[in-house]
Amino acid sequence: MRPDKTTADITPAPVTPAEARKHPNRFYARSDMSLFNWTSNDMKLWNNFTDDGIIFKNTDNDPCPKGWRLPELFDFYSLAANYSNFVQHPDTGQWGRWFSGPNPYGPNVPRIFLPATGLRTRDGASYARDKVTHYWSLRHAGGEGLIWNLYFCDDEVDVTPSAFPHEAFAVRCVKDIEGQRMR
């Protein structure tokens, strides 16, 4: 959904990243040519990395602003070490979870609220807002149909390779630290 609450255009895939950037309000759904992906399979689509694992931004495609990047698996594993029950945010009323990373969860520890945003399926349908969410990582999980992501719902939290590249998930950027390595 766009900020003005109108629905995005849904267009059959595949499409190149360069073409997709020309039309930011389009959602590219799967096609008969590409059942699991809206573009070619490319682990370095959003963030690049050297052979020894140093992460650096692919500024052409990265959805995060300068100084920020998509999370690596370690970022999600660290974040999801401790978390709250599935709750409504006191200010917004949106369902989700509080995450406190390495600190045992409690109301007086540093924490961050991640909302259950739902997702847009490969056919372009909106699904499960306030019930479930997947947050993208920068890590491809091998094969055409797998991307690592932080997943949670009312009774589960997991970092899992169960996401499909063609589905629209939430993006939560993390601070980009120069020279940081993938783990």
Where are these predicted regions, by residue range?
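Low-complexity, Gly/Ser/Thr/Pro- and Asn/Asp-enriched, turn/coil-prone segments
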Residues: 1-42
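C-terminal, surface-exposed recognition/capping segments
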Residues: 25, 30-183
